[in-house]
């Protein structure tokens, strides 16, 4: 830049010596050296026109104006009689921009920074900016601890006054922190203070947060952490006097020294609130109560200010000002806090708008709102609307923006900005195990049908042992009050033997309808009726099955028709859901509890009840919610009524991707104990299980029969997915898990079957551990898991790798 100013000054001086002070009339203007710039464009940028009388000052202004266009590296103005001769050298045009050696900074980010400086392909190159760009990039590397980094701009001339611009990076290595010293600390040890830092001079293997690589930004954050640590413990006079960062001669090591003055501890003597409290003085004073002798705490003071703002925000005061001023009494070591509040104007909502909902209708979003148009602005109501939209599961992100109405002193518009996700899914599941081989299922689900909020699903399974189809429809707003109505019809042809379960065939069909009643923001009750017809055949004589048939008045001597049996049941279905998750898909905080149950009603062939309870709790362990602990449980229990047993085909099962991963689906728990062939009365002694027809005593097999009780739990640690940018953080999730579970039969008579496993024992717990990856793909959620069972029992079947599309728990 200094060179350009010097060049301009020299040209101005030379012009003055040529033209003199008297001036002359310009009859014509000629240009030399124009290539890319049109003559007309150059003339328009000049203050001189043909016919003007020009002097030295006019020539100086002309040169200055031509340089200001940014198109020229050199400008000379000469006189040829009455003609003004303008000689220019155009700046070269950038033909290409390339990067070499940059690993820490991506090409896209570099291009954005260059464009912000006016450096882009097709534009002219201002060489004077290159040194600033080089220095700016090197400063960035220095800020992240790479002090040996260098950046050089290489300009290669090309034909037709074009150049190739190449930025060559030598990033070097990150300087590592050799030692962090804190000088002046007496109340707390240096190790205690540094343990709260992100930067460390020593990092144990288990610490995934600490880092020895120096970064200027992290140091600033650590200094603020240090300040907060003292202020939160009563050291109101704490001060960071200075910070020194020293570099070793080889630029690979960093020494950090922080000089502090701790001061004394101070206690709060009182809080005085003043200002415009908008009639809410009592509520505000409740927020400022302190315990006698309480130490001064900076974080609590900040929280108190935020709580006052939130309180006023609930009453429409959208922009309150709250300032706390501590009055320190050094004599008695106390602090009196003076809080000044200015509630400002109360604001009313003119309009609620939605942006980004290209598929979902406005009415679908608007019915989730708790903030009303025309009412005063309630920050809590706006937040509730955001929570409800997130829990719908239709959107990847939901953001709110409160915009003041131009020209109005007390009106705002509330804008909800959503990014829709694909709510339709093609469900396809594949599992592979050493014993099970390959299994799969398929279906289609649309949770936001045509943007109406209706959930419509067609699901089915077709494989060697099952043909299942189901059509379901749910209207979440059957009434304006939010009462939902859902229904389904289904058909199932199930060959249990081919699924490694006990031997029987069940052809069933049915329907049910359910109403959901919202109790409050987080609780919903459900009630409905259902009908199902079950037609059983090919029943091999095993203990649990025969026990059920006996309770129904069906005995082996009466089952000569290939052991067939049918039942028609009418059920009362009920449920309860508590949902306080922060969003519908990939939640990071909150709890969800879901209870589902049914009981047969008069007119049914069976008499039983059955219920399941699912819970899930997400606990973030960092402020950004990238590291989350997830705990899940599933409980199930059912039994007969009036001396009857719950049907064996209603039993609970465990194992598979939705319960205990690493085990083949439905294989955990009690196994079939078959009666010997001589006890059968169907004339067929051909067994399709592990038992032989020559057996004379009940035979234990590996065929799972399930049980009337189930308990499953999972502890999951959700982590950021490696090599995935923040752009896709809401679409991909990685976790490490530990699953446990068991299924048992409370009606199993261990005395009658001594020598066989006690299937009534709930302590036969299976365990597995592994890693899972979930991806919200265009086809629906993809779930990959690899688990290794490390506690299993005889007859359990493992399935280490499991892959599902459209199935999550």
Curated annotation (Swiss-Prot):
Pfam hit, one:
POTRA
An example GO BP is: protein insertion into membrane
**Keywords attached to this entry:** Cell outer membrane, Membrane, Repeat, Signal, Transmembrane, Transmembrane beta strand
Question: Is Nucleotidyltransferase a UniProt keyword of this protein?
Answer: no
Q: List, alphabetically, the GO terms of the cellular component aspect.
A: Bam protein complex
Localization annotation: Cell outer membrane
Q: What is its main location?
A: membrane
Q: Which InterPro entries match?
A: Bac_surfAg_D15 (IPR000184), BamA/TamA_POTRA (IPR010827), D15-like (IPR039910), OM_assembly_BamA (IPR023707), POTRA (IPR034746)
POTRA domain sequence ranges: 24-91, 92-172, 175-263, 266-344, 347-421
Any keyword DNA-binding? no
Signal sequence segment: 1-20
* Cross-referenced NCBIfam families: OM_YaeT, PRK11067.1
Q: What does this protein do?
A: Part of the outer membrane protein assembly complex, which is involved in assembly and insertion of beta-barrel proteins into the outer membrane. Constitutes, with BamD, the core component of the assembly machinery.
Q: What is this protein called?
A: Outer membrane protein assembly factor BamA
């Amino acid at each position: 830049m200094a060179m350009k100013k010097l060049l301009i000054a020299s040209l101005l001086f030379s012009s003055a010596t040529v033209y003199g002070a008297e001036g002359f009339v310009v009859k014509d203007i000629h240009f030399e050296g124009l290539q890319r710039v049109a003559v007309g464009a150059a003339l328009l940028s000049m203050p001189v026109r043909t016919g003007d009388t020009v002097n030295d000052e006019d020539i100086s202004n002309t040169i200055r104006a031509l340089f200001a266009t940014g198109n020229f590296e050199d400008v000379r103005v000469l006189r040829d009689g009455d003609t003004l001769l303008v000689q220019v050298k155009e700046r070269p045009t950038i033909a290409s921009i390339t990067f070499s050696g940059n690993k820490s900074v991506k090409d896209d980010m570099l291009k954005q920074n260059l464009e912000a400086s006016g450096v882009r392909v097709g534009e002219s190159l201002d060489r004077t900016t290159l040194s600033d760009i080089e220095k700016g990039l090197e400063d960035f590397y220095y800020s992240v601890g790479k002090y040996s980094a260098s950046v050089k701009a290489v300009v290669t001339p090309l034909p037709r006054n074009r150049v190739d611009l190449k930025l060559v990076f030598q990033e070097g290595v990150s300087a590592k922190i050799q030692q962090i010293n804190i000088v002046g600390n007496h109340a707390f040890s240096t190790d205690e203070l540094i343990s709260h830092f992100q930067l460390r001079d020593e990092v144990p293997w288990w610490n995934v947060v600490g880092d020895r690589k120096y970064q200027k930004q992290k140091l600033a954050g650590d200094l603020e952490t240090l300040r907060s640590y003292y202020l939160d413990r009563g050291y109101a006079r704490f001060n960071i006097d200075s910070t020194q960062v020293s570099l070793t001669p080889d630029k690979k090591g960093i020494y950090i020294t922080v000089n502090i003055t701790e001061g004394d501890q101070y206690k709060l003597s009182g809080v005085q609130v003043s200002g415009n409290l908008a009639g809410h003085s009592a509520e505000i004073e409740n927020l400022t109560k302190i315990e006698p002798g309480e130490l001064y705490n900076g974080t609590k003071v900040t929280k108190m200010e935020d709580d006052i703002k939130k309180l006023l925000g609930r009453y429409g005061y959208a922009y309150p000002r709250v300032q706390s001023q501590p009055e320190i009494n050094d004599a008695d070591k106390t602090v009196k806090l003076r809080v000044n509040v200015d509630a400002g104007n109360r604001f009313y909502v003119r309009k609620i708008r939605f942006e980004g909902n290209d598929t979902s209708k406005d009415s679908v979003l608007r019915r989730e709102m708790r903030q009303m148009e025309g009412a005063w602005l309630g920050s809590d109501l706006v937040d509730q609307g955001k929570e409800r939209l997130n829990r719908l599961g239709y959107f990847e992100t939901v953001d709110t923006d409160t915009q003041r109405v131009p020209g109005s002193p007390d009106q705002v518009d509330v804008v909800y900005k959503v990014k829709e996700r694909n709510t339709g899914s093609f469900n396809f599941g594949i599992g592979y195990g050493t014993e099970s081989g390959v299994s799969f299922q398929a279906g289609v689900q649309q949770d936001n049908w045509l943007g109406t909020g209706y959930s419509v699903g067609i699901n089915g399974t077709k494989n060697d042992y099952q043909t299942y189809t189901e059509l379901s429809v749910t209207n979440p707003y059957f009434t304006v009050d939010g009462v939902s109505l859902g229904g389904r019809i289904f058909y199932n042809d199930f060959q249990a033997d081919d699924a490694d379960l006990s031997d029987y065939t069940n052809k069933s069909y049915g329907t049910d309808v359910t109403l959901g009643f919202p109790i409050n923001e987080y609780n919903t009750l459900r009630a409905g009726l259902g009908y199902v017809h079950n037609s059983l055949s090919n029943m091999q004589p095993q203990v649990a099955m025969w026990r059920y048939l006996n309770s129904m008045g069906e005995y082996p001597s009466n089952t000569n028709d290939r052991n067939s049996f049918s039942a028609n049941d009418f059920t009362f279905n009920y449920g309860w859901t508590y949902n306080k998750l922060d969003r519908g898909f990939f939640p990071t905080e909150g709890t969800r509890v879901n209870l589902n149950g049914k009981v047969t009603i008069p007119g049914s062939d069976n008499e039983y009840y059955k219920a399941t309870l699912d819970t899930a709790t997400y606990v973030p362990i960092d402020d950004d919610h990238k590291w989350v602990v997830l705990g899940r449980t599933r409980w199930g229990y059912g039994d007969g009524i009036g001396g009857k047993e719950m049907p064996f085909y209603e039993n609970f099962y465990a194992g598979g991707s939705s319960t205990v991963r690493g085990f083949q689906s439905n294989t955990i728990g009690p196994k079939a104990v078959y009666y010997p062939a001589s006890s059968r009365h169907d004339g067929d002694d051909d067994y399709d299980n592990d038992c032989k027809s020559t057996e004379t005593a009940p035979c234990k097999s590996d065929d799972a029969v399930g049980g009337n009780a189930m308990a499953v739990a999972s502890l999951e640690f959700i982590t950021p997915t490696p090599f995935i940018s923040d752009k896709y953080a809401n679409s991909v999730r990685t976790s490490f898990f530990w699953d446990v579970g068991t299924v048992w039969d409370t009606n199993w008579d261990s005395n009658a079957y001594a020598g066989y496993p006690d299937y009534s024992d709930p302590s036969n717990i299976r365990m597995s551990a592994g890693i899972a990856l979930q991806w919200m793909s265009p086809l629906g959620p993809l779930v990959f898991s690899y688990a290794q069972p490390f506690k299993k029992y005889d007859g359990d079947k493992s399935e280490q790798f499991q892959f599902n599309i459209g199935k999550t728990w």
